[in-house]
Structure formats: structure tokens, C-alpha cells
């Protein structure tokens, strides 16, 4: 059963000179326990589509259905906080917070119980032990920072993980670690993992690949 659906989703925005039809009639159902890759050339609409799935933008036409209800009918802030976890290429860690504090942050926003214990569990789940907890992000490698970002996503308690070019700043070794971790989260932990990528290694490991061209699935 699908946890997230795109139904006839279009997105049009006004550029400096003209209207741009970035996403054109996308229909797709995403399921828990699966690892998806969205691929295509730059400008094909894949990041725009991910932004719509994340609730950062509303579709011009059509709708996104989460757990049986349109996101247009939901509180967008609560949807983004509780339903979706977003992982970016640039990690987006707070530079003055420790590793542990970065993972704690989304739980403090929703006043979660046992937040410290959960943060430690999620850090262990991504392969970071206690020796990392009090470090600042600047003390970590790119791959380690991305693992902290994934741990923070897990701490949000959402079942959908959206990732925009999560291996874009990583070397081959760290890219493989992150890809394997995201795949494991889908197959062993039951998350719905959706990744926008140019990385063919991610596409090769995905359960399903959505190829976009000029805003369409092809």
C-alpha cells in the first residue's frame, strides 16, 4: 500500500522572462520499504518534484496524497516536521551544535520523550559511536557529516526520507557507505526512501527508478 502519491501533479512558476512548466502531469505511488531514485538531466524537474513531495511547494495542479489525505488539507508545518525527513547535499548541520545536539534538534521541536536516548540510538544506527557525540561538524569528514544528517532524519520519526543529491559532495568510498545505509533503511527498517541523484550507483541499487525529461516521467 502506498504511503505517498502524486496525482496529476503540475508545477508552473514565473521566471524573469516567461512561465516555466517544470513538472507535467506526474502520477506515481511510493510505498514503504522501498528505495526510489529520481534521475534526469539538470533542469528536468526532479528537484522541483522532490520539493513538492516535501511540502516546500504546492503543486499548481493536482495533489500529493500522504497516508490517504491530500497535503493541501494538512497543516504544512506539521507535515514537514512529522511526515517527511529531508536530507540535502550540503548536510545543513548547525555548525555550533555538537553531533548529538544536531540529532536532538528535531525531537526538541516536537517535545519528544527520551530524546537523548533516541539520538544516541540513531547515531549508532548510522555507524557513529560515543567518540563522535561531542564533536562539532567541522571536525568531521563529509561522509561523517552526511551520516549525522541521516541520523537526524531518522530522529524525526517520519517514515519518508527524501534526499537531494546526498552523495554529491562525497568521494566514492563515502558515497557507497551512504547509499548502502539508505538502502538498508528502506529494506530492513521499512522507510520509504526517495533520492534525487545524478549518481548511477544509486540508480543501480534502487528498487524503482523514475526518469524525468522536460517535467515528464519517461
State the predicted function of each range.
Residues 114-131:
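Conserved ABC ATPase "signature" region
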Residues 161-164:
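Catalytic Walker B motif of ABC-type/P-loop ATPase nucleotide-binding domains
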Residues 54:
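Helix-to-loop junction immediately C-terminal to a conserved catalytic motif
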Residues 136-140, 144-146:
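Conserved ABC ATPase signature
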Residues 70-85:
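ABC ATPase NBD coupling module
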Residues 62-71:
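Conserved ABC transporter NBD signature motif
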Residues 97-104:
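Short coil-to-helix segment of the ABC ATPase nucleotide-binding domain corresponding to the Q-loop/switch region
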Amino acid at each position: 500500500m502506498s504511503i505517498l502519491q502524486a496525482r496529476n501533479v503540475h508545477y508552473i512558476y514565473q521566471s524573469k522572462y516567461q512561465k516555466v512548466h517544470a513538472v507535467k502531469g506526474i502520477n506515481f505511488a511510493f510505498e514503504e520499504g522501498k528505495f526510489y531514485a529520481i534521475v534526469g538531466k539538470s533542469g528536468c524537474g526532479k528537484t522541483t518534484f522532490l520539493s513538492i513531495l516535501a511540502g516546500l511547494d504546492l503543486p499548481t495542479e493536482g495533489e500529493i496524497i500522504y497516508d490517504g489525505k491530500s497535503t493541501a488539507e494538512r497543516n504544512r508545518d506539521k507535515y514537514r516536521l512529522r511526515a517527511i525527513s529531508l536530507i540535502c547535499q550540503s548536510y545543513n548541520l548547525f555548525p555550533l551544535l555538537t553531533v548529538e545536539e544536531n540529532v536532538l534538534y528535531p525531537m526538541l521541536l516536537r517535545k519528544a520523550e527520551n530524546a537523548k536516548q533516541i539520538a544516541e540510538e540513531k547515531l549508532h544506527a548510522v555507524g557513529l559511536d560515543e567518540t563522535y557525540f561531542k564533536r562539532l561538524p567541522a571536525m568531521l569528514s563529509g561522509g561523517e557529516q552526511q551520516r549525522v544528517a541521516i541520523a537526524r532524519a531518522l530522529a524525526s520519526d517520519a517514515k519518508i526520507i527524501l534526499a537531494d543529491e546526498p552523495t554529491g559532495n562525497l568521494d566514492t568510498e563515502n558515497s557507497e557507505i551512504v547509499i548502502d545505509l539508505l538502502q538498508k533503511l528502506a529494506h530492513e527498517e521499512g522507510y520509504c526512501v526517495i533520492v534525487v541523484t545524478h549518481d548511477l550507483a544509486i540508480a543501480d541499487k534502487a528498487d524503482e527508478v523514475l526518469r524525468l525529461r522536460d517535467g515528464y516521467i519517461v
